[in-house]
């Protein structure tokens, strides 16, 4: 009895676990160094549907696969900053894990390093990627990523699929969407994007589904 009372007293005297850091978000014009890097890497170039002045650096708090709090940076269209702040605030509250949201891993020299291909990112001046059902490499139309109005979330865990195929063979373990694993898109994540009017590629009609992809117009 004495040992039980002593243990209870010790537990009562223990400090509470540290509070989880509060969510933080901020947006700003792209710094000159980032503009230069995006241009040097060909992520932005003359002829893109938006200028560098139309893009913003969105900094948000997110929860990693290590259960820790991290700071991520996304290059997004100016009009996307407010809705995406709302979305990532909800994802942080839901404790939804994101593998990586590091600027250098998405756009810098680190983007060429093996293992840095599970990065959640937004802007990329490129055409929409054809369905894995085809062998094509371009569609002839701009992707919503080219406007900074789309986000890919955990690409490895949420592959772009069609006709039983994907363009990332390492994502094959995630073909089975009925067996949930950390980082896979959930209904609550879809609802978070839907609350700001953004659609999900996993809800496209037909066989082709882009499970990672969320955009302002649903395409």
Regions found by a protein language model. Give the residues of each.
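Secretory targeting and sorting signals
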Residues: 1-16
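N-terminal module-boundary/linker segments of secreted carbohydrate-active enzymes
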Residues: 14-68
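Post-signal peptide N-terminal regions of Sec-secreted extracellular proteins
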Residues: 16-27, 49-51, 81, 196-197, ...
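Active-site acidic/histidine clusters and adjacent loop/turn architecture
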Residues: 50-118
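Active-site-adjacent loop/helix surface patches within enzyme catalytic domains
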Residues: 102-145, 158-160
């Amino acid at each position: 009895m004495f040992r039980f009372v002593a243990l209870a007293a010790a537990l009562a005297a223990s400090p509470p676990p540290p509070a989880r850091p509060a969510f933080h978000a901020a947006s700003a014009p792209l710094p000159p160094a980032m503009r230069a890097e995006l241009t040097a890497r060909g992520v932005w170039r003359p002829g893109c549907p938006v200028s560098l002045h139309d893009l913003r650096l969105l900094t948000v708090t997110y929860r990693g696969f290590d259960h820790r709090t991290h700071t991520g940076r996304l290059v997004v269209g100016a009009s996307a900053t407010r809705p995406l702040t709302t979305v990532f605030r909800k994802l942080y509250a839901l404790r939804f894990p994101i593998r990586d949201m590091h600027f250098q891993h998405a756009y810098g020299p680190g983007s060429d390093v093996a293992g840095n291909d599970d990065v959640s990112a937004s802007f990329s001046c490129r055409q929409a990627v054809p369905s894995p059902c085809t062998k094509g490499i371009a569609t002839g139309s701009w992707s919503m990523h080219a406007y900074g109005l789309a986000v890919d979330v955990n690409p490895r865990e949420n592959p772009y699929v069609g006709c039983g195929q994907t363009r990332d063979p390492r994502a094959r373990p995630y073909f089975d969407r009925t067996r949930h694993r950390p980082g896979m898109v959930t209904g609550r994540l879809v609802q978070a994007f839907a609350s700001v009017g953004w659609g999900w590629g996993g809800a496209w009609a037909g066989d082709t589904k882009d499970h990672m992809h969320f955009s302002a117009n649903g395409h």
